[in-house]
């Protein structure tokens, strides 16, 4: 693939991702976008539930399988290595677009907060979650995570190197602040419907499973540095009572890399 074409492809894939990310905020929050998680049910409950579970499964399988090193080894025999990450980002975006398009509301209220202060607090926590997701990507390497660094290096004729293992700020408190952000974004709502609950439960289960695969790959890439980090820093819930020690331990791991 021509270097300029590869670079433009990476930019297009990133633009599709970012538009999808913004749509996801509206979809989960039931604001602005034409289709959202809590529309008016049009199908019987059982049929709608099966469709929603299938859509979530499509995303989970795509997102996890395409991220595994074994799949990448086979995939890069077809797709050039420098656009592999951009292609992964594109496929993930398409899986989410399919979910947004075909999602079937279930109806039914689990909880509803009518107090203005309570609603605003939950909206604030949801917004905090989305900001935490985005901030967490920039703390490590946003542009590598979404394929832009790879196509930029290819455009410049430079070899790609996997990013070094670092534990900046939030990563000294928990190993996966990005996933913490998603959990806040998915669960913090003043109007929890059956539809939203299914989405929140299933995505949380997926996050807990995905972490196991992701950390196995991180150990493969970073070896003892990540093993030590995993022993010393909690996965999702910070040790608030021993925050100082956790920060010092993570800093020690970072210095040893």
Region roles according to the model:
Residues 43-57, 118-137:
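Alpha-helical transmembrane segments
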Residues 14-34:
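Alpha-helical transmembrane segments of multi-pass membrane proteins
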Residues 19, 23-26, 46, 55, ...:
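Hydrophobic transmembrane alpha-helices
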Residues 65-73, 103-111, 137-153, 214:
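Juxtamembrane/interfacial segments flanking transmembrane helices
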Residues 39-47, 74-91, 156-160:
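Juxtamembrane helix-capping/reentrant segments at transmembrane boundaries
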Residues 2-14, 85:
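Alpha-helical transmembrane segments and their helix-start/interface "positive-inside/aromatic belt" motifs
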Residues 30-42, 72-76, 104-116:
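Membrane-interface helix termini and inter-helical loops of multi-pass transporters
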């Amino acid at each position: 693939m021509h270097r300029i074409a590869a670079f433009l492809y990476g930019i297009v894939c990133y633009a599709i991702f970012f538009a999808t990310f913004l749509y996801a905020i509206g979809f989960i929050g039931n604001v602005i976008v034409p289709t959202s998680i809590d529309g008016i049910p049009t199908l019987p409950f059982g049929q709608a539930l099966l469709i929603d579970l299938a859509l979530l499964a499509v995303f989970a399988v795509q997102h996890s399988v395409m991220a595994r090193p074994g799949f990448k080894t086979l995939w890069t025999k077809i797709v050039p290595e420098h656009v592999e990450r951009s292609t992964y980002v594109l496929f993930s975006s398409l899986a989410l677009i399919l979910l947004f398009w075909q999602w079937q509301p279930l109806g039914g209220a689990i909880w509803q907060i009518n107090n203005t202060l309570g609603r605003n607090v939950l909206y604030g926590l949801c917004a905090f979650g989305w900001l935490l997701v985005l901030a967490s990507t920039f703390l490590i390497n946003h542009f590598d995570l979404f394929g832009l660094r790879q196509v930029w290096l290819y455009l410049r004729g430079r070899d790609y190197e996997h990013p070094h293992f670092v534990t900046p700020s939030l990563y000294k408190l928990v190993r996966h602040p990005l996933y913490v952000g998603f959990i806040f974004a998915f669960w913090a709502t003043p109007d929890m419907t059956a539809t939203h609950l299914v989405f929140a439960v299933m995505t949380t289960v997926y996050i807990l499973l995905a972490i196991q695969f992701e950390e196995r790959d991180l150990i493969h890439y970073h070896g003892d540095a990540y093993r030590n980090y995993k022993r010393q820093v909690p996965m999702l819930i910070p040790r608030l009572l021993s925050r100082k020690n956790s920060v010092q331990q993570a800093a020690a791991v970072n210095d040893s890399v």
